[in-house]
Amino acid sequence: MFKKTLVTSAVLTTLLAHAAQAETFRVGMGDPIDSDQGALAQRFKELVEQLSEGEMQVELFPGGQLGSETSMIQDTRIGKLDFALVGVGNLTPYAARLGALTMPYAIRSHADAVKATTGTLADRWNAIAEEEAGVHIVSWLYSNFRYLTNSQRPVTALEDIEGLKIRVPQNELMLATYEAWGASPISMSWPEVFTGLQQGVIDGQDNPYIVNYTMKFHEVQDYLTEVHYQYSLQPIVMGVRTYEKLSDEERAIIDRAGLEAQLYALQFQLTEASKARAAMEEEGVEIATLEDEEEWIRIAKEEVWPEFYDAIGGQESFEEMQKALGH
């Protein structure tokens, strides 16, 4: 009996010691857990905990529980939050050169998006993010093209968008793009968008199919147009000061988990986007394509690109990226 008690005590001591050593990391994101953000975050959590053999635990906070994307970015920069999963456009106020990834029609396919966020180009963006924004890019979420929704009318030609109040993130490039097309863009924080649409403060917004469906925008939007102007890329970021406090082993685990989760999320996107599109149609959303997208492209290239070359590192730098993508 005495031996049994000693063994039990030893086991409990070991378990308690292990629990005490486990470190918990918080991940904040704006979308629901059943979104593509949720898919990436859940896979990242599984991988971190698996690779660390439970010594690193991850807690997820979906649906804007920890604030807007802008506030979560700021919290990661100062070390108040461990990870934030955010739209790359919301990082550009801190690291303007990342705006190259949001230039209209810079990325034109899934293949472009993958090439832009792996290998040497991925290293380039991470160096910029660390230097300018004070965050380390852990992973990338491929969320597909940002398609335009609105409550007023079908948009099939440039003239149809004139005057529509379109929500955009806090991103000067996106504001300028919609203004060049004749719309009336309004910068609005992500948690406010559904209410803004519901109350008519804004007429529309743009996001990929999975986001549009999981956010239930079909309840307040009647029309969707497949405008291929911007591929939505959303990185998981960690503050540099937090990242540098980790051991070499912990950093390796986080980076490996991030890359593997990124590949998982790409497959998730490819299989789930078509389901979300069909579901929105079933909910009564009228889906259209542009009859004159070449004109949208021309305006973007001639009026928007030149205005932002300096902000994103110069025309030569942007053209190098385009060349790397085969454009």
Positions of PLM-derived features:
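Bacterial N-terminal signal peptides that target proteins for export
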Residues: 1-7
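N-terminal secretory/targeting leader peptides
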Residues: 11-12, 23-112, 121-327
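Sec/Tat signal peptide C-region and signal peptidase I cleavage site
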Residues: 16-22
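Hydrophobic helical h-region of N-terminal Sec-dependent signal peptides
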Residues: 7-16
